[in-house]
Amino acid sequence: MTDSLIRIAVAGSGGRMGRQLIQAVQQAPGVVLGAAISRPGSSLIGTDAGELAGVGALGVTVSDSLEKVVDDFDILIDFTRPESTLAYLAFCVEHKKAMVIGTTGFDDAGKDAIRAAGQQIGIVFAANFSVGVNLVLKLLEKAAQVMGDYTDIEIIEAHHRHKVDAPSGTALAMGEAIAGALGRDLKECAVYAREGYTGERDPKSIGFATVRAGDIVGEHTAMFADIGERVEITHKASSRMTFASGAVRAASWLHNHDKGLFDMRDVLNLDQL
């Protein structure tokens, strides 16, 4: 631990989220952009990362590999794709670099790899880095404890047309929060699609519905529906900056933890509520 600035590397720096992350690093106290990574062969290699993100020249050029910038960063923030994240993870374990992982769509093997890596380096792994979403997850646990056993539970999520995984990682996290509060296994009670003659609804199921359209940043609603009333808990994001700022906040928090697997509940100390 040091009083100097925390050096952040941003993976996928040429993407929508990567540029937002660079902006968030520039706006946050106590951190500085140390490196920016893009895929090999990208036309952005060699570009100034600050100019790419619209914050002015920073003197940090986009690189095509972590090996080339290994001495330039302390923590990697990665919102890319599972296969890229796992490759970065192996590198960070080898070189004792901490990671903030916002990538979604991992299979069980990928999640196991992240858990194992948390025994050697510090990792914050979350489906959503928005402070509001993580507060919603806490509220859902409370709602499930009060209403979950006698209501029908449905989760509806909407994202932009370019999102490649469904349901979203946040929707699944909402389902896990609810199922955990009710002592259920989400793998056993989740219903991801309904078509044709489905029969009556299983009262113990948790349903998911997905929308992909336009430029929706992210909207999630959990519904607890009874006869005569229903409670809906909704979060709507209007800018990716909320996720980027949360990820940088997580990186600042993680700098004080040498190893361990954490999520935003830890960063925000939500378990104390």
UniProtKB/Swiss-Prot annotation:
Active-site annotation: H159, K163
Domain of life of the source: Bacteria
Keyword Phosphoprotein: no
Binding site for NAD(+): G12, S13, G14, G15, R16, M17, G102, T103, T104, A126, A127, N128, F129
Binding-site residues, (S)-2,3,4,5-tetrahydrodipicolinate: H160, G169, T170
GO MF, one annotated term: 4-hydroxy-tetrahydrodipicolinate reductase
Binding site residues for NADP(+): R39
The reaction(s) this protein catalyses: (S)-2,3,4,5-tetrahydrodipicolinate + NAD(+) + H2O = (2S,4S)-4-hydroxy-2,3,4,5-tetrahydrodipicolinate + NADH + H(+); (S)-2,3,4,5-tetrahydrodipicolinate + NADP(+) + H2O = (2S,4S)-4-hydroxy-2,3,4,5-tetrahydrodipicolinate + NADPH + H(+)
Subunit structure: Homotetramer.
Function: Catalyzes the conversion of 4-hydroxy-tetrahydrodipicolinate (HTPA) to tetrahydrodipicolinate.
Name recorded for this polypeptide: 4-hydroxy-tetrahydrodipicolinate reductase
Gene: dapB
